[in-house]
């Protein structure tokens, strides 16, 4: 039996893009901070002039799939991370945004054979989003760790 899994100890050769939705930036900035902290602690160059890491800002979570498609098609990155925060309101817009963004991102990942970490928080309240972006824990850290594991796993499978 063969057992293959991703590792977190050699991120020095990975090219990573983080695509961040500006909408609800109080939350997405915190997620980005947690994400960068994790990447840095695992050996990724996160400096301003980093050849390893690019950060791309989009207006909202609906725009994430299109930009992921553009980035994935370049073949430059081993993994993409999406960050967003969609908070339920009084209209069905919440369901439309999360359904379309998640389906679009999953489709891009399958079509291009690149891992894309879905780091879009979907919460009922701002308080719940804040708890997941730093008050209780920062899921940005988890998304970065998932990205490193998936990039490593894909490398091992090739």
Curated annotation (Swiss-Prot):
GO terms for cellular component: cytosol; riboflavin synthase complex. This is 6,7-dimethyl-8-ribityllumazine synthase. One of its GO terms (molecular function) is 6,7-dimethyl-8-ribityllumazine synthase activity. It is an enzyme of class 2 (transferase). It catalyses: (2S)-2-hydroxy-3-oxobutyl phosphate + 5-amino-6-(D-ribitylamino)uracil = 6,7-dimethyl-8-(1-D-ribityl)lumazine + phosphate + 2 H2O + H(+). 5-amino-6-(D-ribitylamino)uracil binds at residues 23, 61-63, 85-87, 118. Catalyzes the formation of 6,7-dimethyl-8-ribityllumazine by condensation of 5-amino-6-(D-ribitylamino)uracil with 3,4-dihydroxy-2-butanone 4-phosphate. This is the penultimate step in the biosynthesis of riboflavin. The keyword Repeat does not apply. Gene3D superfamilies: Lumazine/riboflavin synthase (3.40.50.960). The active site is at 93 (proton donor). Pfam families: DMRL_synthase (PF00885). (2S)-2-hydroxy-3-oxobutyl phosphate binds at residues 90-91, 132. Belongs to the DMRL synthase family. HAMAP family: Lumazine_synth. NCBIfam families: lumazine-synth. Its EC number is 2.5.1.78. The gene is ribH. GO terms for biological process: riboflavin biosynthetic process. Keywords: Riboflavin biosynthesis, Transferase. It comes from the Bacteria. SUPFAM superfamilies: Lumazine synthase.
């Amino acid at each position: 039996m063969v057992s293959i899994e991703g590792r977190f100890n050699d991120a020095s050769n990975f090219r990573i893009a983080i695509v961040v939705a500006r909408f609800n930036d109080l939350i997405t900035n915190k997620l980005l901070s947690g994400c960068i902290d994790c990447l840095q602690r695992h050996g990724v160059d996160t400096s301003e002039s980093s050849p390893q890491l690019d950060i791309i800002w989009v207006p909202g979570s609906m725009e994430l799939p299109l930009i992921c498609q553009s980035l994935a098609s370049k073949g430059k990155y081993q993994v993409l991370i999406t960050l967003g925060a969609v908070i339920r309101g009084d209209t069905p817009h919440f369901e439309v945004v999360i359904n379309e963004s998640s389906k679009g991102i999953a489709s891009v990942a399958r079509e291009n054979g690149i891992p894309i970490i879905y780091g879009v928080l979907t919460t009922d309240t701002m308080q719940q989003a804040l708890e997941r972006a730093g008050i209780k824990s920062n899921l940005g850290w988890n998304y970065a760790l998932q990205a490193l594991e998936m990039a490593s796993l894909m490398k091992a499978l090739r």
